[in-house]
Amino acid sequence: MSIDALKNELPEYAKDLKLNLSSLGRETELDDQKKWGTFLASAHAVGEPKTLAAIKAEAETRLSDEALTAAKAASAIMGMNNVYYRFVHLSKNKEYATLPAKLRMNILANPGVDKADFELWSLAVSAINGCGLCIDSHEAELRKHGLTTTQVQAAVRIAATVNAIAAVLAAES
């Protein structure tokens, strides 16, 4: 499935999502690896089959094998970390924040791509999954790597749009 086919799957009431998907595909704040890695990590995180198939097909034409794997790895590790750290952050019992996580996270040390790209993809997935602690942590790392607020915003706009498209398609299936 292509991006155009994905847009055609959306009902008329989701026209804004179609338009956002088109404009985000042409987004110039991010280079192709950052942009399409964000698209893929976001689609992988939401998991809706049509959304994932279309975005994966496009990403495969724009990303190296290493970047494809790293984008999926960002989604996978954030699927775990976002739940754990959201719990730590939201729990009234602050003792949990003093305990070691005791969860393997080796991919964070060596993601196989530029660290800033992996952080950006992790931020996008964290936004989808609603982990404020993770969002703050990744955003701070991105700033250290020199990314601008408009670059970070572009990634979150991609995540938001992919999430909304997946929700519409899931509801309409």
Swiss-Prot record:
It catalyses: N(6)-[(R)-dihydrolipoyl]-L-lysyl-[lipoyl-carrier protein] + a hydroperoxide = N(6)-[(R)-lipoyl]-L-lysyl-[lipoyl-carrier protein] + an alcohol + H2O. It comes from Maricaulis maris (strain MCS10) (Caulobacter maris). Keywords: Antioxidant, Disulfide bond, Oxidoreductase, Peroxidase, Redox-active center. Disulfide bonds join C131-C134. The active site is at C131 (proton donor), C134 (cysteine sulfenic acid (-soh) intermediate). It is an enzyme of class 1 (oxidoreductase). One of its GO terms (biological process) is cell redox homeostasis. This is Alkyl hydroperoxide reductase AhpD. Its EC number is 1.11.1.28. The keyword Disulfide bond applies. GO terms for molecular function: alkyl hydroperoxide reductase activity; disulfide oxidoreductase activity; hydroperoxide reductase activity; peroxiredoxin activity. SUPFAM superfamilies: AhpD-like. The keyword Oxidoreductase applies. Antioxidant protein with alkyl hydroperoxidase activity. Required for the reduction of the AhpC active site cysteine residues and for the regeneration of the AhpC enzyme activity. InterPro entries: AhpD, AhpD-like, AhpD_core, CMD-like. Belongs to the AhpD family. It comes from the Bacteria.
